[in-house]
Amino acid sequence: MNNIVLAVLQGVVVMAVAPFFSGLGRVIRAKMHNRRGPSIMQDYRDLAKLFARPESQSEDASFALRIMPPLFFAVAFMLAMGLPLFTAQSPIPVFGDAITIMYSLALARFFFALCGVDSSNAYAGIGGVRELLMSVLIEPSMLLALFATALVCGSTDIATMGQHIMTGAVDAPVAVILAGIAFAIACYMELGKLPFDQAEAEQELQEGPLAELSGPSLAMAKLAMSMKQVLVVAWFCAIFVPWGEPATVGAAAVLGAVIFLVKCLIDFVVCGVIENSCSRSRFKVLGNQTWAVVGIAVLAFVFVVVGV
């Protein structure tokens, strides 16, 4: 029972703080550009306005357009319940498995891209193609890094992997370090940060598939995208930066929640500084910039085989 309560609490907290962290990136960008910029609470206001507006959809819209926002949000909330965020143990272990997480994110990405490709809007189609391209570039390095770490730790469970790294019970520490570097870069790409993308871009870039959405559906999709960013950061921290989380469920989970939020705050600030020190690249040439990440992940896998 305690695990179920903790799982729901994790989902609610991630949903509540996701707009804050997405707004934090915009504030950092404005400060580094020496301009005033929006308030850090602007994303909350935008979501409130969208939820209050009536929804408008084409009569010819397919099931993909209708099902994508609730599906995307459900996947994000499910992963928030399963990841070991506030404690070192996963509240729902079946949702905290690396393979489950990868396939869940792939499912959400597939419907997100399908929503754009299915539309007759040209910008939405470009956005859908962009999502599929980013999937091809990011997922191989993520999978290789995760499998290398899973082989060292003997499990694909996120909590177990984090415990092995926290206690130093790994037979190939160099491989784990390389896998962590590759996974960190892949997570940065997944966040949609410069130079790979711009998370607040307009319809012809990241938010292309949202061009045909409006009202509550658009708000739900935007909230799910913000939750996904927090979950990607939490995913990295749960495996490679697991220190500070309490071992059991209970009152100590409150301290674990504070530590989790501090980790997310530090990560988002670092990502914001890095992002605003780069210039954006065309998404069609991103493959030239991701070979190094795949190479690091492959090298980590090789080091696991030789036991280094």
What are these regions (language model features)?
Residues V270-A297:
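Interfacial loop-to-transmembrane junctions
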Residues L6-V17, P93-A106, G168-E190, A253-G256:
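Alpha-helical transmembrane segments
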Residues D46-A64, A122-I126, P209, L213-S217:
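Cytosolic juxtamembrane amphipathic/interface segments immediately preceding
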Residues P91, A148-V176:
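Juxtamembrane/interfacial segments at transmembrane-helix boundaries in multi-pass membrane proteins
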Residues M81, T100-C115, V136-T149, C153:
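Mid-bilayer segments of alpha-helical transmembrane spans in multi-pass integral membrane proteins
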